[in-house]
């Protein structure tokens, strides 16, 4: 029946799942706090003309509504835009760099056939005001330490750079319009289509080889050395130098076993300007997190500053962890009016020991057998008798 249905893409979190999410969320934010990132909240609703327009999420995926003054609002589609707004308006007088974190639900309209959630929780951080490679490395290393603290050990972080493929495409093809065709193949990870398209282009065999070799630039630090064979522009060489420096810093963090370079990586997030990365875990078909540098976003809020950060999908992380829902044992105290005072005192004493105690008046139970089966232990305070335990 309609009364039991939810809007498309929305999900319930029943008690067991809720407790599991709470535990995993804490394991992530614990590391974030330990690295000096202070958690904050922003409104669920934002103005479309500010956060909505600046979001990298496509307009068709935004949930829009009108307020009583006729202004268009959006349910926040991500957290980077809202935090950029706050940094520009409320935190701009604080000394940079700023380190802030969040754990919040975001909203994106989905096609009915896609089967994806329209509401999901992101846990992440933003490092604002530091444009160095060291800041990029800190953010990526924090992902590694946070995921390990959550209990995930089988994962990889693929790292790329926005400008590498772009400079190669423009250098070979001559303009961004032609480059956009190849970029779309990479974004969709349609490598077969990419190869077929390159082979049909009216280019020299040398230039075709350069474009095709881009797909092979995946692996460890040696990838940057192989890339020098196809990257000839000064901007491209500077990108490779950044990636080498990033790798060296991540080596010092002790993180490189979880890292691989993928120089063919592109992103649908239009605000990324430099290093970008995606997090993959075994047995999960989609990325469980992503991040990167977005040095131009805060300028749209009249507070230009470099920034980098990441967001992890809590639902996909739970899938990767493959953890059972938490159903902690509970005990019940069933009482009648005659021993209510004793029952209350007993329950408080047990709660002080860290136990979860449900107090239930006998008068409010319709089926005592069904009710008591849900509990690990039941203690009775009924009639004139003292407590009688039935475990």
Swiss-Prot record:
Keywords: Amino-acid biosynthesis, Cytoplasm, Histidine biosynthesis. One of its GO terms (molecular function) is histidine-tRNA ligase activity. The keyword Cell membrane does not apply. GO terms for cellular component: cytoplasm. Pfam families: HisZ-like, tRNA-synt_His. It is found in: Cytoplasm. It comes from the Bacteria. Coiled coil: none annotated. One of its GO terms (biological process) is histidyl-tRNA aminoacylation. Pathway: Amino-acid biosynthesis; L-histidine biosynthesis; L-histidine from 5-phospho-alpha-D-ribose 1-diphosphate: step 1/9. InterPro entries: aa-tRNA-synth_II, aa-tRNA-synth_II/BPL/LPL, HisRS-like_core, HisRS/HisZ, HisZ, HisZ-C. This function is generally fulfilled by the C-terminal part of HisG, which is missing in some bacteria such as this one. Heteromultimer composed of HisG and HisZ subunits. NCBIfam families: hisZ_biosyn_reg (TIGR00443), PRK12292.2-4 (NF008941). Belongs to the class-II aminoacyl-tRNA synthetase family. HisZ subfamily. Required for the first step of histidine biosynthesis. May allow the feedback regulation of ATP phosphoribosyltransferase activity by histidine. This is ATP phosphoribosyltransferase regulatory subunit. It comes from Bacillus pumilus (strain SAFR-032). The lineage of its organism: Bacteria, Bacillati, Bacillota, Bacilli, Bacillales. The gene is hisZ.
């Amino acid at each position: 029946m309609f009364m039991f249905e939810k809007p498309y893409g929305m999900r319930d979190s029943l008690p067991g799942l809720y407790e599991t999410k709470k535990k995993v969320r804490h394991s992530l934010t614990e590391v974030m706090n330990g690295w000096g990132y202070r958690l904050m909240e922003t409104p669920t609703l934002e103005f479309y003309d500010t956060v909505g327009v600046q979001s990298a999420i496509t307009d068709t995926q935004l949930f829009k509504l009108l307020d009583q003054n006729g202004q268009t609002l959006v349910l926040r589609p991500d957290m980077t835009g809202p935090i950029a707004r706050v940094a520009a308006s409320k935190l701009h007088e604080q000394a940079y760099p700023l380190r802030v974190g969040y754990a919040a639900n975001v909203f994106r309209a989905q096609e009915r056939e896609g089967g994806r959630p329209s509401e999901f929780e992101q846990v992440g951080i933003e490092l604002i005001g530091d444009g160095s490679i060291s800041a990029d490395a800190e953010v990526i290393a924090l992902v590694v330490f946070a995921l390990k603290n959550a209990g995930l050990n089988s994962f990889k972080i693929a790292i790329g750079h926005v400008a590498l493929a772009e400079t190669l495409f423009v250098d070979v093809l001559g303009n961004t319009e032609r480059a956009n065709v190849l970029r779309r193949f990479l974004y969709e990870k349609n490598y077969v289509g990419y190869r077929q398209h390159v082979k049909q282009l009216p280019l020299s065999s040398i230039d075709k080889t350069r474009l095709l070799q881009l797909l092979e630039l995946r692996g460890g630090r040696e990838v940057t050395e192989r890339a020098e064979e196809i990257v000839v522009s000064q901007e491209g060489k500077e990108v490779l130098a950044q990636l080498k420096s990033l790798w060296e810093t991540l080596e010092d963090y002790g993180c490189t076993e979880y890292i691989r370079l993928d120089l063919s990586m592109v992103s649908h997030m239009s605000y990324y300007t430099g290093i970008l990365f995606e997090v993959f875990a075994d047995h999960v078909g989609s990325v469980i997190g992503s991040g990167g540098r977005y040095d131009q976003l805060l300028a749209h809020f009249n507070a230009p500053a470099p920034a980098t950060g990441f967001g992890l999908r809590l639902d996909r992380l739970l899938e990767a962890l493959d953890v059972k829902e938490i159903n902690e044992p509970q005990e019940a105290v069933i009482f009648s009016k005659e021993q209510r005072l004793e029952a209350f005192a007993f329950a408080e004493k047990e709660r002080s020991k860290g136990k979860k105690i449900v107090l239930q008046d006998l008068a409010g139970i319709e089926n005592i057998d069904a009710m008591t089966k849900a509990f690990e232990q039941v203690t009775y305070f009924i009639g004139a008798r003292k407590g009688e335990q039935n475990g």
